[in-house]
């Protein structure tokens, strides 16, 4: 009887001791190992959040670039249209020039250049004489060329006049372009076409002679449409004489 009671008490004590050993003990949260593991876990959890935020921040920055890339062809098209309209307007403003008007303008340019050559030669001669009169021509002629002072003065005066005559066409051409600047583009186009025709239809000057001279090789005497037709007839007559050996 007493033995059975003792066995029961021993069994209960053993069972209670096992259950006490099997129950989990609380982890020490204040240890440094636990704190280190906790920090590592927090870092691993914070990484995807940071990447997601960077992605979210990068997405809006790409939108203005795509919009600018899409809008750039539109601006290019509008700029091209504006340039094309301006070019068409400038072409429409250029006046048309027929051949008779071209020859009239060509003759007026020749008159401008001739008048400017005369005026420039006179001005350069007067200025040159005034400058030379102040110089010692006797010693200059004797030292340099050994000539008489009057001969040196005459040569210097002629040189001054020649310089003015050669500079006159440049001055006259500039004045003519300023006066007729409205017809300048059309005139230049007609002039290019005119010289192309002259180069195409003029004769070969290799067989030139006294009996059969070359008729106006550069077309300088042409002053109208009738003059151009006469020039073509002269070129054909020269070729006929050259072929028939009437030289």
Swiss-Prot record:
Provide the membrane topology annotation. Answer: Multi-pass membrane protein
What cellular component terms from Gene Ontology apply here?
PAM complex, Tim23 associated import motor
The organism sits in which domain of life? Eukaryota
Q: Which InterPro entries match?
A: Pam17 (IPR013875)
Pfam families per record? Pam17
Q: Please provide the Gene Ontology terms (biological process) for this protein.
A: protein import into mitochondrial matrix
Q: Where in the cell is it found?
A: Mitochondrion inner membrane
Keyword list (alphabetical) reads:
Membrane, Mitochondrion, Mitochondrion inner membrane, Protein transport, Transit peptide, Translocation, Transmembrane, Transmembrane helix, Transport
Question: What is the transit peptide's residue range?
Answer: 1-49
Q: Provide the transmembrane region boundaries.
A: 112-132, 150-170
Query: Residues of the signal sequence?
Result: none
Tell me, how does this one assemble? Component of the PAM complex, at least composed of mtHsp70, MGE1/mgeA, tim44, PAM16/pamP, PAM17/pamQ and PAM18/pamR.
Question: Which family does the record claim for this protein?
Answer: Belongs to the PAM17 family.
Q: Tell me, in a sentence or two, what this protein's role is.
A: Component of the PAM complex, a complex required for the translocation of transit peptide-containing proteins from the inner membrane into the mitochondrial matrix in an ATP-dependent manner.
Q: What is this protein called?
A: Presequence translocated-associated motor subunit pam17, mitochondrial
Source species, please? Aspergillus fumigatus (strain ATCC MYA-4609 / CBS 101355 / FGSC A1100 / Af293) (Neosartorya fumigata)
